[in-house]
Regions:
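Active-site-adjacent structural elements in folded domains
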Residues: 112-115, 208, 291-299, 362-366, ...
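Acidic/polar, glycine-enriched structural segments that form the non-catalytic walls/loops
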Residues: 3-15, 114, 122-127, 134-303, ...
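Long, charged, mostly alpha-helical binding arms that flank functional sites
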Residues: 257, 432-434, 440-461
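Aromatic-rich carbohydrate-recognition surfaces in CAZymes
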Residues: 301-433, 458-462, 466
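Beta-strand-rich N-terminal accessory domains
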Residues: 1-104, 122, 228, 270-273, ...
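Active-site-adjacent bridging/hinge elements
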Residues: 279-294, 298-299, 347-359, 433-447
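Proline/serine/threonine-rich low-complexity linkers at boundaries of modular beta-sandwich domains
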Residues: 106-109
Length: 484
């Protein structure tokens, strides 16, 4: 590749950084995830809905619910405690009423009513059960209200990117117990959120559901809710809630059971290991090409090539099936043509994949983006390490054409100026200026502070290339391709 043919790299081009207004630190949050759906709540289990708030229920890079709040007589309950349980499957919160006023007087003293919220995410939907119990000595009548909204914001919007235009939103009532929120995007994809309540609320609009609850001393009322991707495939009853919670926990238990058991005489160490296993397997997501460890919630709950490969390398000793899933997924998404807007060339391994409206419209380049200099040699290195760990020659044989294509990319496109070093240089100003592990726009600079201009050769990438070629030779020999 002739360096003179490369476009001028404009350092002022957008770098898709997370905006300083997209703050998750001022509010302690709780996260649940299953598959391509995750939820970020505050400690009460609410989704706030305020401008600049990053909480929400997200599905495939779209915030499908931007507000979901529980109110008691139009007041926020007091937080007693909340936690995400050890298996990361279920969130619970204990709440109570504040002092409630009527006519300037305290009509209901604090902590007479206990509210217990239980939530989990499963197959595109958040399930919730709310228990309300009267701990007072007299009958009580209170109003419980759920306030909700969906802005259908693209994840990059939530992160701080601004858009000039949006699609159209609609809301409709469905019988007396469900609401459907719809958004027709500029990409002509309709995204639909359905909220259902059991039993039916006393009043229901397209923005709130209210229950007039009468409780005798010691009496408990249960309300079941379901909100998420509309498919109508699962019953909307309390029985369905418990069945789906068992299914969610069983699936996570079965997946994490693949990991080798690690135990010691130190209880703190054992707890750290158990929590780490739960965190890791929460991120592993089934895809049509195999299971893949997503890079992390909330901003990176999607496949990243480098992150998936390094995760697979680090976990080969406890669960090599993670590496097998990563290899198959990245082989299925390997570039086959030159596409400058994607920074793609034949044999190159994926950097990032996105599914939202902005990616579909190419307002951001990450629908299927290949701007990563290290993922391609790391792919070959992982295949070699996987073979050393497992001896699985069938997988090596199936993926050998992809490994060959990756090795060809290193020689044909990786070394852009023929100096023996593999370097990177984005092909358009819409791509990432820096394409190594440190990929912010100012990550690579000279000793005097000046920003380095491409092509840029990173020292660790040369080691990855060396490792890829050694592993490539090992695999070729195992397949009988002597002299390859």
């Amino acid at each position: 590749v002739n360096t003179s043919d490369l476009p001028v790299d404009d350092a002022s081009a957008p770098q898709y950084a997370i905006s300083a207004t997209a703050n998750l630190q001022e509010r302690r949050t709780r996260t649940l995830k299953h598959g391509d759906t995750f939820a970020v709540f505050d400690q009460r289990g609410d989704i706030g809905g305020e401008p600049g708030n990053s909480e929400g229920l997200y599905h495939r890079d779209t915030r499908i619910l931007s507000q979901f709040q529980l109110l008691l007589e139009e007041a926020r309950p007091l937080l007693l405690s909340s936690m995400t349980q050890d298996d990361n499957a279920v969130f619970s919160a204990d709440l109570s009423n504040p002092d409630l006023l009527a006519g300037g007087q305290i009509a209901l003293r604090r902590e007479q009513i206990h509210l217990h919220r239980l939530k989990f995410v499963w197959e595109g939907t958040c399930y919730e059960r709310v228990l309300a119990r009267n701990f007072g000595n007299a009958p009580l009548g209170v109003r419980l209200t759920f306030r909700f909204a969906a802005d259908f914001a693209d994840l990059f919007e939530v992160r701080g990117e601004r858009r000039k235009a949006h699609g159209e939103a609609f809301a409709t009532l469905e019988s007396g117990h469900a609401v459907v929120l719809r958004y027709l995007g500029l990409d002509q994809i309709e995204r639909v959120t359905r909220l259902a309540f059991e039993p039916a609320p006393t009043t229901l609009t397209t923005a709130r559901a209210a229950y007039e609850v009468r409780l005798k001393p010691g009496e408990t009322r249960r309300i079941f809710l379901r909100y998420g991707v509309a498919d109508g495939s699962v019953e909307w009853t309390g029985r369905g809630f418990y069945r789906q919670m068992r299914a969610a926990r069983h699936a996570l238990r079965m997946t994490s059971a693949r990991a080798a058991s690690v135990d010691s005489s130190n209880s703190v160490f054992n707890e750290i290991v158990r929590r780490s296993v739960s965190d890791l397997y929460m991120l592993i997501t089934d895809t049509p090409s195999g299971s893949y460890p997503y890079a992390g919630t909330p901003w990176f709950s999607t496949p990243f090539g480098r992150d998936g490969i390094i995760t697979a390398l680090m976990t080969l000793w406890i669960d090599p099936t993670i590496a097998k899933g990563v290899l198959h997924f990245l082989a299925a998404t390997q570039a086959t043509a030159i596409e400058p807007v994607r920074d793609a060339e034949p044999g190159k391994i994926l950097h990032e994949m996105r599914y939202g409206e902005m990616a579909n419209l190419r307002e951001v380049p990450f629908g299927r983006y290949y701007g990563s200099v290290d993922a391609t040699p790391l792919f070959v290195l992982l295949l070699g390490e996987y073979f050393v760990r497992t001896g699985d020659l069938d997988t090596v044989r199936a993926l050998w054409p992809n490994a060959e294509a990756a090795l060809r990319w290193i020689d044909a496109y990786g070394d852009r100026d023929g100096d023996g070093f593999v370097e990177y240089y984005r092909q358009t100003n819409e791509g990432l200026a820096n394409q190594g592990w440190k990929d912010s726009h100012d990550a690579v600079f000279h000793s005097d502070g000046r920003t380095a201009e491409g092509p840029i050769a990173l020292c660790e990438v040369q080691a990855y290339v060396y490792g890829a070629k050694r592993h490539g030779a090992l695999l070729a020999g195992a397949l009988g391709h002597h002299g390859a």
